[in-house]
């Protein structure tokens, strides 16, 4: 994993999202669910992911965020988890199973340790988009389409109007994720927003190439970045 991250960084990734595996990742499609199962079977723990970040931070300077589930944070101990994030150099936390209404469970700790709690914005009402955007920190994760993560052949949501409402309410950058896999899609999303988030497409490369995958992930990241 460290090699893959370093290749992604060397080829122009602007931010790295690392998943801490959970047995029931409700926001994820089959590709990332499969990766969660494999990681847990291989003995990946929260502490091992923390150690990975400590190693990466020897030379990786771009922002890094964790994506995981509330249960993972609770079972580790929320304060211990979030304070460790700060110490090892994690900039933000993405918890897809915590809706806006429940973020107070984690927000005070995130603010205490200066770790951004990343807000999700899905296709929803203008009022709700504005409400979430006004309180967002770090960056806003715009969900391209309702459903789970995974690659999609086309994205039909009117994302431009969602981003317009976000921009009217905050200067926090927003990036679009869920279903982005091709350079063409990435360009389209980056034209609308501040960036594109890619997960499943990279996991597929890792599944296909195994030990040889860092090189291929690097090439893929470069192709995506060049398209922007």
Where are these regions (language model features)?
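Catalytic cores of alpha/beta
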Residues: 1-8, 124-134, 176, 180-196
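Active-site-adjacent beta->alpha loops and helix N-cap segments on the catalytic face
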Residues: 23-32, 41-54, 74-80, 95-112, ...
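Short beta-strand/loop segments at the ligand-binding rim of alpha/beta enzyme cores
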Residues: 59-69, 110-120, 167-177
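Conserved, mostly hydrophobic/aromatic
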Residues: 19, 85, 132, 189, ...
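Glycine-rich phosphate-binding active-site loops on the catalytic face of alpha/beta enzymes
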Residues: 13-25, 90-94, 99, 144-150, ...
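Histidine/lysine/aspartate-rich catalytic loop segments that bind and position anionic ligands
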Residues: 115-150
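Active-site/ligand-binding-proximal alpha/beta "capping" segment
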Residues: 142-144, 149-195
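Active-site beta->alpha loop and helix N-cap motifs at the rims of alpha/beta catalytic domains
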Residues: 4, 9, 14-16, 20-22, ...
């Amino acid at each position: 994993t460290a090699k893959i991250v370093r290749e992604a960084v060397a080829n122009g990734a602007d931010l790295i999202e690392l998943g801490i595996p959970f047995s029931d990742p409700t926001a994820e499609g089959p590709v990332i669910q499969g990766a969660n199962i494999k990681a847990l079977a291989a003995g990946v723990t929260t502490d091992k992911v923390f150690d990975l970040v400590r190693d990466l931070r020897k030379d990786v300077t771009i922002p890094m965020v964790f994506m995981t589930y509330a249960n993972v944070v609770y079972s580790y101990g929320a304060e211990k988890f979030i304070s460790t994030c700060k110490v090892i150099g994690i900039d933000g936390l993405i918890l897809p199973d915590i809706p806006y209404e429940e973020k107070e469970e984690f927000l005070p700790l995130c603010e205490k340790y200066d770790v951004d709690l990343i807000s999700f914005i899905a296709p929803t009402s203008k009022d709700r988009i504005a409400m979430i955007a006004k309180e967002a920190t770090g960056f806003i994760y715009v969900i391209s389409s309702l459903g789970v993560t995974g690659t999609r052949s086309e994205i039909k949501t009117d994302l431009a109007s969602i981003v317009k409402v976000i921009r009217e309410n905050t200067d926090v950058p927003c990036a679009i994720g869920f279903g982005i896999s091709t350079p063409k899609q990435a360009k389209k999303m980056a034209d609308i927003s501040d960036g594109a988030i890619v997960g499943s497409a990279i996991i597929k490369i890792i599944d296909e190439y195994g030990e040889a995958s860092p090189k291929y992930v690097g090439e893929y990241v470069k192709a995506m970045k060049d398209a922007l």
